[in-house]
Amino acid sequence: MSTDEFEARLEAFRGDLPAVRPNARTVAAALDTPDCRRRRILEAASVDKSELARHLGHPIPAAQSPFALRRGNLFESAVKENGDAHLIAELRKQIDLPIPATRHKDLSSSRARTKGLKEMKLRAKETQAALSLLLSEDPYAPNVLDHAVTSLEVGGSTVYLEQDALAHYTGNKLYVVEIKSFPVINNQVDPVKLRPATRQAAVYILSLQQTLARMGHSPEKVATDAVLICPRNYDLTPTSATLDTRQELRGLRRQLDRAASVSELEALLPQGLTLSAADTEHCAEAVEQLPNAYRPACLDSGCELAYYCRSRARDAGETVALGTPVRQAFGPVDMIDDVLAMADSGIAPSRYEQDLAADLIHMQKLYRAAGGGAA
């Protein structure tokens, strides 16, 4: 099956559910759960998993409040207003971009009036044309590219990502710019927010490296430091720093090596399977035909279906639904009923389960001795 045919099949599978554009956050999160083929197929089909979770009756809390979203949009607008004045000022601080030599190009929309995947493909081509001009050392080439679209290969399929900005300076390096709305207070950033920002910047850097490689240029032209622009304190005045993403890049490359291939996804997606926003039961049946690997870490990875998959694991009586410590304590025993039967000496343990069985029987005796059950 050709790439175009598989893309058409994925679009048909998505049915009437809305499509969402992937970004660095969703790519990084999906790579954190490489064993879950369900998530991989839904990501490849650009399914709005938040909407899907709502249809399935297990919506997740919004990742950001409306206030936070509005603040983020306001801050990015502030950074880029007046011809990218603040953006260019911060680039001058971090990478010595000379202001008189700054030439800006906005790639936020394609000249061809299309939408969806076709638009992203066209914008990616227009970004490559701008990059070719820039790397040719044309003195009039734009060297600050707003909303450039680069591509990342994940298991043989192409993911198109819109960058906040790319900048090139006289040292012959391309820099990824990441604009975030969390504040820098007294020159300190909350590490809980800094870690995912660094990881997302690494996704964009890797995407830009792959794009240059496909164009015949060296990936070494991309700096492994990203420029992070955030508000200073609690107002919208920008400040900036550089992020060293080398460790994150190494981890991402390892995860990409483990990502499911397109041929594997083709084999796992049943022919004719579609999602339907109008029929919850049909939607659930379709989702259940996609193999998953629920782990408590799915809740931390930001997967919108984590609550749904946990509910299904709980209904099935799987120990994994009780959390990581419990799952690890029970080792090879996957089902709660088997654990309870083993504690009651109702089933004979295998040689791998004998120590666990002895512990469970001992705990059961202590529980009963304390009056917690029938003697």
Name every feature range the model reports, one short phrase each.
Residues M1-H168, K173:
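Metal-dependent nuclease catalytic cores that hydrolyze phosphodiester bonds in DNA/RNA
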Residues C36, C298-C303, C309:
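Short cysteine clusters
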Residues A141, A148-R258:
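Mg2+/Mn2+-dependent nuclease catalytic core
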Residues L243-G302:
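Polybasic (Lys/Arg-rich)
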Residues R312-L322:
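Short cysteine/histidine-rich zinc-coordinating motifs and their immediately flanking basic loops
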